[in-house]
Each structure stands twice: as C-alpha cells, then as structure tokens.
C-alpha cells in the first residue's frame, strides 16, 4: 500500500476514498499510537461544516473509544482552534475532520500531537503500520475500560477569548466585511470581530453542509472584492473552509494575498523589535516582489519548499516568529502552532487601526511582479526530466538570461498529480506567457 498520509493528513472523496471504515481505523490506530501507555487518554475532535463530517466523526470517535480513550467533541470549529484547544484542555492529541479549501465532496482527517503540532512522518507511518497489520497487539478493552465521549460546550468561547488576546487593541470605529466561506469560521470570526467593537457585515456565513468553499472564501474572493467597495468598508477578510488561512481586501477592492500580509506584518513586527533575527520564513512560490519589499525593509527571508508544514519546521528549528504562504496560510508562532486565519485577520486589522493608515497604503510597501503558471503533463517517473535533459536546461538558462535579475524561473514537480509546474516572474506579462507555455510544451514533449 502507498503512503496513506499526504502533506495535510489523510484526504479523499468522502464515502469513496475516505470511508467510515477508514475513519474508524484511523481513530483506533491514532488513539493507540498517540497515547501510548497513558492512563485513560483524552483526544479532542473538531470538524468543519461539510455534510460528511457527521458520518466521519461518528466513525472516528467509535475508533477512539474502542481503545479505551476519551473523545472530547468540540463540534464545528476552525482547524487552528483544535490545535489551540488541544493544548488548553491538556489533551493527549487532537483530530480535525476537514478538507480545508477543497470542494465539498472531499474530506480529511488530520492529527495534532499534545502540543498542537501536526504529526511527524514517523508517527503517521506508525499509525499506518498498525492499520496494515490489522491491529495486531492493539487491545480491545471491556467493561469500565471502554472510552467515553464528552461534548465540550465552551470550546468556541475559549477559542474566541484566545484570539482576542492576540491583539492589544479593540476595533471600534472600523467597518469590516467578512467572507466565512460557509465554513468553520461562520460563528467564531463574526463573534470575535463584534465583541471587539467593529461594525461587521458578513457574506457566506450560512453553511448548509454543501456550500462550503463554493464560489466563496479565500479561494474565490471576487464577491468580497466587490462587496467591500459597495458597502464602503475599511477592509474585507476572506477565510477558507477550515479557517486556517485568510486573505484580505483593501478599501479599494484590491486583493491583499499572503505575500502582502507577510510584508505588512513583517515590517510592523520589525519596527516594534518583535521579529526574531529580523527573519520571515516564506516558500519558493512567494512573489519576487515580497523578497524585494522585505529586503528594502532590512528583513531577511528564509525559503522553504511549498507547504505550511515545511514553513513551520524551519520556524521551529531557528525560533523564527513569522512565516507563511501566498495562499494566506500565515503562522504567528508566538500565538499558535499552525496557520490561523482569525489571528491573521485580527493582526491585519490591529495594524490598520494602530498605524492610522488605510490597508492600501500599508500594502504599497510591496509591488507584485506579474507571475505566470503553466502545467506540463508528465508521467510520474519522468518528473525530473527538467534536471536531466540538456535542451530543457539550455532553454531555462536562456529565459533566465532574458529576465536578468528582474524575474525568475521556478520548476516544481507536483506532489499529487502527474504534472510539472512551470512558474515565471518578471515585468512583461505577455512575454512571460509566451515563455512559460513554450517551456511547459518543451518539457511535455521531451517527457512523453
């Protein structure tokens, strides 16, 4: 069997790939591995608003209880809330049932350890090994040793209280639009901003189990971009389905993506002397404009592979405080162990309020270079061809010379599909289009 866990837990189409049976087995194996030898271990379980959440929660919880662990169910809360509450309630582990920004037919199961961090590859492999061994040596307790399920009613309030504590100001006098993606932020985000005194208008906060991420939220911010201008708001904030990411919209209706957010927050933290070693951790996919803006502000960047888990690894290694991705996964390590959309949203608003500048003015420290993406369809065993083929490497060299320091070429094999992604950045969008698609076609031709 191939590896069950991807970069973000176990994901698949609910009831087809991610079945109730698999959820039960993951609950059972996960509870056993993560609470080894602990007396009556406690595991926190939360989920987003997908229709398949109830089915998977019931199965997962059965698995947890079957090995004698206690399941603490916190209902619909953001993924970062599960990471935080696992620590707060001193649970042995946390599990979230969500497929984040993916369409509704997908769902996922992701584990956190007792400290609120995503599991290491080794622990995930151990869970898989137990499932593949058909639970050899895993006890099935009886009588009073069977686990119990507890519903934690105050989870939402506890998370809101934590989120509010991350900024040192109220938001009175600010008019803010929220797009909750019909997802897990639909209560917590709205309540938090209202309790801080902001005038809040909300779209896409009426989840019906099927409309999560559907033409809304951080993956489709177009509606919010119009709405902010129409309603004359100071800014808008868009979350994804499980609210671990957040994008902003300025008062003019422009999208402020994760790169702009890191530029704004990085400069703010540096000016306050709170940016450890004056470093921001970013991925190779961040826009070159971010590197130039941070460099101008005397902030160093450390680059990682794509994926918030790699950003987090680098931050933990060196004690860096701020890192993230263009997609709006921003990690403030002083506050949470994972990307937290609500904390990111509050940080942006507090900086706007404290600086007395508009969001568009704050964002003007960065100029985004045009970026073009092209995909080359390539068999999985030929994904390294761009490193080995002379004609391809000559073409890459030629493009790099043409961009001469005012752009770049990035080639990245997809981790999940038979594709190689070609990304070009520079100043002339039309020319980039021609070059990127030409290079993708060449890679495709040579690989097939």
From Swiss-Prot:
InterPro entries for this protein: A-D-PHexomutase_a/b/a-I, A-D-PHexomutase_a/b/a-I/II/III, A-D-PHexomutase_a/b/a-II, A-D-PHexomutase_a/b/a-III, A-D-PHexomutase_C, A-D-PHexomutase_C_sf, A-D-PHexomutase_CS, Alpha-D-phosphohexomutase_SF
Cited Pfam families: PGM_PMM_I, PGM_PMM_II, PGM_PMM_III, PGM_PMM_IV
Protein family according to the UniProt entry: Belongs to the phosphohexose mutase family.
Keyword Methyltransferase: no
Chain positions recorded as Mg(2+) binding sites: 100, 240, 242, 244
The protein, known as: Phosphoglucosamine mutase
Enzyme class: isomerase
Role, per record: Catalyzes the conversion of glucosamine-6-phosphate to glucosamine-1-phosphate.
Active site positions, chain numbering: 100 (phosphoserine intermediate)
């Amino acid at each position: 069997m191939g590896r069950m866990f991807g970069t973000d837990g176990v994901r698949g189409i609910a009831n087809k790939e991610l079945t109730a049976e698999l959820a039960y087995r993951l609950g059972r194996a996960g509870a056993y591995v993560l609470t080894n030898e602990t007396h009556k271990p406690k595991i926190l379980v939360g989920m987003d608003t997908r229709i398949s959440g109830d089915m998977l929660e019931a199965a997962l919880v059965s698995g947890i209880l079957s090995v004698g662990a206690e399941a603490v169910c916190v209902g619909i809360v953001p993924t970062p809330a599960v990471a935080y509450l696992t620590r707060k309630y001193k649970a042995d582990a946390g599990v979230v049932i969500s497929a984040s920004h993916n369409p509704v037919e997908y769902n996922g199961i992701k584990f956190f350890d007792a400290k609120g961090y995503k599991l290491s590859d080794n622990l995930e492999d151990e869970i898989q090994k137990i499932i593949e061994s058909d639970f050899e040596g895993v006890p099935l307790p009886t009588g009073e040793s069977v686990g119990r399920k507890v519903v934690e009613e105050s989870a939402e309030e506890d998370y809101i209280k934590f989120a509010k504590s991350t900024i040192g100001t109220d938001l009175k006098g600010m008019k803010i639009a929220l797009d909750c993606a019909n997802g897990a932020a639909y209560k917590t985000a709205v309540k938090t901003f209202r309790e801080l005194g902001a005038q809040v208008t909300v779209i896409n906060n009426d989840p019906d189990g099927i409309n999560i991420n559907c033409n809304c939220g951080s993956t489709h911010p177009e509606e919010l971009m119009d709405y902010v201008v129409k309603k004359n708001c100071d800014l808008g904030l868009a979350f994804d389905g499980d609210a671990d990411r957040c994008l902003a919209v300025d008062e003019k209706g422009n999208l402020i993506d994760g790169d702009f957010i890191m530029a704004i927050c990085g400069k703010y933290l540096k000016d306050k002397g709170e940016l450890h070693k004056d470093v921001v951790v970013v991925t190779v996919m961040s826009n070159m404009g971010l590197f130039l803006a941070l460099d101008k502000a005397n902030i160093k960047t450390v680059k990682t592979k794509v994926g918030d888990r790699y950003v987090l690894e680098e931050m933990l290694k060196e004690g860096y405080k701020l890192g993230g991705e263009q997609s709006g996964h921003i990690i403030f390590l002083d506050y949470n162990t994972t990307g937290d959309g609500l904390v990111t949203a509050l940080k942006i608003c507090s900086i706007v309020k404290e600086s007395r500048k508009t969001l568009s003015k704050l964002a003007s420290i960065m100029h985004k270079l045009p970026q073009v993406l092209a995909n080359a369809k390539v068999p999985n065993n030929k994904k390294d061809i761009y490193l080995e083929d002379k004609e391809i490497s000559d073409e890459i060299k030629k493009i790099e010379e043409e961009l001469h320091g005012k752009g770049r070429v990035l080639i990245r094999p997809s981790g999940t599909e038979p594709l190689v992604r070609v990304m070009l950045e520079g100043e002339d969008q039309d020319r980039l289009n021609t070059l990127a698609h030409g290079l993708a076609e060449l890679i495709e031709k040579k690989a097939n």
